[in-house]
Amino acid sequence: MKKLYRRLLDICYENKLHHLGSYFSCLHIIDEIYRTKNEDDIFILSNGHAVVALYVVLEKYYGLDAQELLDKYGEHPKRNELDRIHCSTGSLGMGICVAVGRAVGNPNRHVHVMISDGESNEGSVWEALRYINDSGLKNITVHVNANGWAAYDPVNIMLLEQRMRAFCPGRLKFHRTTVNYFGLDNSLHAHYTNFTEEQYKEAIASL
């Protein structure tokens, strides 16, 4: 993980990227998915604003250059199966719906999808969770990156987990994470800032 964090740090600093809290809070989850999934399984990042974390994981496991992916696709994923990007996302709540469709369309292929806690404000997320449960869909896993922050406000993680497990008890993995990485505040500031030179050097030194 140390090399992944360093790679993500470098790209974020060199490109003056925001959404740092989203990137760093989900990096270890995406890495674990790719480390353990079957080769044929697919991954969809529904909270597309965290895509730079996906880019560095794709670099690790498939040799794709993370900086080139950022230059090519930008800060939200655009579907290109050749580059292992299985869904264009950005508008929150849409990726999980596509993931459900992919799982229904091919029962022999497992689909992993990540959503964020802030994304749970979208009604389509709850429709998808209910459909997964009511239809008995088995070849999908919904990973929730619960870092405690939505776009404008904190999220009640305990209440959110209770509600989500009530909707979809069988296919949910709820990951309680934090945005407090490398000196970032555990606040909205972690989502809407970029690294200064001083912060970057301190972050590198802490690895």
Residue ranges of predicted features:
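Short, structured coil/loop segments at alpha-helix boundaries
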Residues: 1-2, 197
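Glycine-rich ThDP/TPP pyrophosphate-binding loop and its adjacent helix/strand module
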Residues: 78-207
